[in-house]
């Protein structure tokens, strides 16, 4: 059996990139300051990097799945060009009130459900207890709880933080950029 690895599960909009609302074009995709360096450092620390993103804009007819895939490929290559190799990219195109019939459904992949995280766990042999979920919304924290992710990290770079989201999180950080240092500080043995 393959050895399990710890992972950093990453929401996309508001965590990796600025959330301009239904981001689906390269021209509107803006990496948040410091996140690329942080992702590179997290890889060096031995974490798998896994993007788990709700993309209801597909179901809502705001953009097509092909447009999302083109942007995702560009993001993946942009990160790879900066020595950040993602281990997985999982997305949910569904929404129960979607206008595109093919994607209008209740599913187990849309956060707060844990489907994307569990799929990644099974495929990549992830040690969930040693992993982190980083996101900007309550649904990210709820998905992490449902998937038994060890540490839930809420970031201030996306949607305004709600009291419910803050209560569900283990840590609240200003940005994903702060995560490597926070993990190192936590892992430091007591003197």
Swiss-Prot record:
One of its GO terms (biological process) is ADP-L-glycero-beta-D-manno-heptose biosynthetic process. The keyword Metal-binding applies. One of its GO terms (molecular function) is magnesium ion binding. Magnesium. Can also use other divalent metal cations as manganese and cobalt. Its cofactor is Mg(2+); Mn(2+); Co(2+); Zn(2+). Pathway: Nucleotide-sugar biosynthesis; ADP-L-glycero-beta-D-manno-heptose biosynthesis; ADP-L-glycero-beta-D-manno-heptose from D-glycero-beta-D-manno-heptose 7-phosphate: step 2/4; Bacterial outer membrane biogenesis; LPS core biosynthesis. InterPro entries: HAD-like_sf, HAD-SF_hydro_IIIA, HAD_sf, Heptose_bisP_phosphatase, Histidinol-phos. Mg(2+) binds at residues 11, 13, 136-137. Optimum pH is between 6 and 7.5. It comes from the Bacteria. The record marks 53, 111 as: Stabilizes the phosphoryl group. Monomer. Zn(2+) binds at residues 92, 94, 107, 109. Keywords: Carbohydrate metabolism, Cytoplasm, Hydrolase, Lipopolysaccharide biosynthesis, Magnesium, Metal-binding, Zinc. This is D-glycero-beta-D-manno-heptose-1,7-bisphosphate 7-phosphatase. The active site is at 11 (nucleophile), 13 (proton donor). Phosphatase activity is essential for nucleotide activation (fourth step). Zinc ion does not directly participate in catalysis, but probably functions to stabilize the loop conformation.
